[in-house]
């Protein structure tokens, strides 16, 4: 088997794992914010803190340099995504939220790729049109239109995640950089929780859902995604994320 084929298979497997983790995030978040009493700000904080701890442990076990990685701009994008994501899922179903999120991701990343001079292939153009058409169809007034506030929050989260993904395409050590971004996002999450303290609410089920979302679906999932991003073009990275709403819808 050629090294090129092995490399492509590795990227495919990593991408599949990352997309499954992303869908798991939608399902866990919706489950926690719909079926438990945890509030969106607390969910966001627990998710980011548990993701930071999980990634720090993984980075420590892998050894290598112990210097700080990541940067504050990526951390801010990560926090804006996580916060908007949580507050949006208070009112949105998992599948609808995922479609809005990754439709916005698609438009953001492909738009940047075109601006940077990348050419759009046929399947990527089809994915772009599907995402754009899906967003328009969802947001048009009608019986099936999702709540406006939740939709706007999720679209904002999608743009933030698109920016975060774009900033990860040229990364070095994916795990260490993602860990650094999560650690830097903790103060932002803490400030949000303090601001929302009068509405804070925690329960054990919601707490554990947030930990699973942070440590497994977010921390580990994002580290895998950053690794996979090294082997795909910006426009392809955007298109493949359209699989997430399908996985989330099938999962519930």
Q: Where on the chain are the PLM-derived regions?
A:
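Specific transmembrane alpha-helical segments of multi-pass solute transporters/efflux pumps
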Residues: 21, 62-102, 108-110, 130-137, ...
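Helix-helix packing/entry segments at the starts of transmembrane helices
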Residues: 97-104, 168-187, 218-252
């Amino acid at each position: 088997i050629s090294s090129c084929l092995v490399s492509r298979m590795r990227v495919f497997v990593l991408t599949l794992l990352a997309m499954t983790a992303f869908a798991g995030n939608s399902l866990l978040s919706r489950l926690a914010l719909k079926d438990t009493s945890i509030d969106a700000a607390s969910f966001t904080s627990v998710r980011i803190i548990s993701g930071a701890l999980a990634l720090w442990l993984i980075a420590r076990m892998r050894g290598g340099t112990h210097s700080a990685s990541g940067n504050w701009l990526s951390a801010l994008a990560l926090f804006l995504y996580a916060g908007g994501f949580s507050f949006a899922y208070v009112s949105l179903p998992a599948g609808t939220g995922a479609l809005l999120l990754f439709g916005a991701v698609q438009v953001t990343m492909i738009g940047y790729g075109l601006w940077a001079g990348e050419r759009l292939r046929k399947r990527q153009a089809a994915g772009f049109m599907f995402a754009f058409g899906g967003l328009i169809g969802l947001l048009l007034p009608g019986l099936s239109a999702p709540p406006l506030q939740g939709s706007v929050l999720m679209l904002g989260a999608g743009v933030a995640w698109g920016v975060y993904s774009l900033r990860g395409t040229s990364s070095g050590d994916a795990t260490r950089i993602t860990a650094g971004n999560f650690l830097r996002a903790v103060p932002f999450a803490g400030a949000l929780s303090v601001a929302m303290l009068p509405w804070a609410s925690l329960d054990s089920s919601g707490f554990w859902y947030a930990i699973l979302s942070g440590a497994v679906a977010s921390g580990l999932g994002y580290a895998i995604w950053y690794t996979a991003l090294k082997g795909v073009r910006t426009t392809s990275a955007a298109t493949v994320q359209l699989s997430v709403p399908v996985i989330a819808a099938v999962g519930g």
